[in-house]
A protein has these predicted regions:
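The feature primarily captures lumenal catalytic ectodomains
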Residues: 1-234
């Protein structure tokens, strides 16, 4: 496996599918994760929920390994059918239809923050949304929360990958930096059979790192889109 498995978004987007493929093809007896000496908690919980024995997982940082047979997993675009299957595996199967509307705040993040969140959040709150910082939740709690969610909004970031755990037909509202617009989350939303909405935002300052800039969003545009989502939900 490649060396980006400590990136939450890439883990969900690509590595989960590779683990499932390894299981199907009988290649999951010994899985090597290069470059890191320890797996994160979400790495471990994913592996456990896929029912792969942890004894089969071997993180390593050695320069040279000698193996009898090595299978390399090709780094290719994600497969929607794999992500939908993973959602079915880990979903909480609540008898109650999804009811939450979740706004994920990046106020605890070190970068890519919403500068005018104090103006934006009251609009969400007035329409019955709840504010969440994903840093406060375990991986299992994030899955449970999203399985109960019918509408989701946030700035683009790693936590956006959690939309794969939302039930089919949910609404996804991305607040996107218009200078670095990407189709990644749109493609993911489509793959999971969600409705997708886009709200553009504007840079504040200029971070030397690509795509790390803080942003401001147009509160009137946000309110307009939220009204459309609310109409669709009701």
């Amino acid at each position: 496996f490649g060396m980006w498995y400590r990136n939450y978004f890439l883990w969900l987007l690509t590595y989960v599918s590779r683990l499932m493929l390894a299981m199907e093809t009988g290649c999951s007896d010994e899985i090597l994760f290069p470059g890191e000496s320890a797996l994160s908690s979400y790495n471990i919980r994913t592996i456990e929920r896929l029912k792969i024995p942890m004894k089969n997982i071997m993180p390593y940082d050695e320069v040279v390994w000698h193996v009898d047979r090595l299978t390399l997993v090709h780094d290719e675009p994600f497969r929607g059918n794999r992500l939908r299957e993973f959602r079915d595996i880990v979903s909480c199967n609540s008898p109650r239809p999804p009811w939450r509307k979740v706004f994920v705040s990046r106020e605890k993040a070190q970068y890519r923050r919403l500068v005018n969140q104090d103006e934006v959040w009251p609009i969400f709150k007035r329409m019955g949304w709840q504010k969440v910082c994903m840093e406060d939740l375990s991986f299992d709690d994030q899955i449970k929360l999203m399985s109960e969610t019918r509408a989701f909004s946030s700035l683009n970031g790693a936590g956006f990958g959690n939309i794969i755990f939302m039930p089919k037909g949910a609404h996804v509202f991305e607040l996107c930096n218009e200078e670095i617009m990407s189709a990644s989350f749109y493609a993911m939303a489509c793959a999971m059979d969600h409705h997708y909405w886009l709200g553009k935002s504007f840079l504040v300052g200029k971070d030397y790192r690509y795509a790390f800039d803080d942003v401001i969003v147009d509160i009137h545009a946000v309110e307009s889109i939220l009204n459309l989502i609310e109409y669709q939900l009701t």
